[in-house]
C-alpha cells in the first residue's frame, strides 16, 4: 500500500474454530497447518473433485502484529456476533445472519473487521 492507503480485512473470528466439535483446533498459531480433504467445491458442480486444503490459524494478536510490522495503523476494529456465510453446524438466526447451532443462545464473535491505513 502507498502511504495513506487503506486495508479492509473481514475474516472469521479465530474464536469460532474452538467450537468445531469435528476438528477442534488450538487458538494460537502453529507451524504445522490443519489439513482438510473434502469432496466437491463451494461452487455448483465439481462434486467428483477431491480437494485437500491447508489452513493456519492466527490469533488476533498475530494479525495485529503483522499489520504493525508492515506499517499499518488500525483505525477500526469491530466484532460481529454472526457470520454472513453459513458454515457447517450453523443455523440462520435472522436473514443473512448465521450462528453456531449449538451456541445460538450465546452471543459469540463469529467474524471481525479491521480497517487500517499505511503510515
Model regions and ranges:
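Helix-to-beta-strand junctions that scaffold the AdoMet/dcAdoMet cofactor pocket
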Residues: 1-3
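Low-complexity, flexible helical/coil segments
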Residues: 13-20, 42-49, 64-65, 111-117
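Conserved class I S-adenosyl-L-methionine
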Residues: 6-41
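Core SAM-dependent methyltransferase catalytic element
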Residues: 69-73, 90-119
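Class I S-adenosyl-L-methionine
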Residues: 41-51, 82-106
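Conserved beta-strand edge residues that scaffold enzyme active sites
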Residues: 14-15, 80-82
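Short alpha-helix
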Residues: 41-43, 52-79
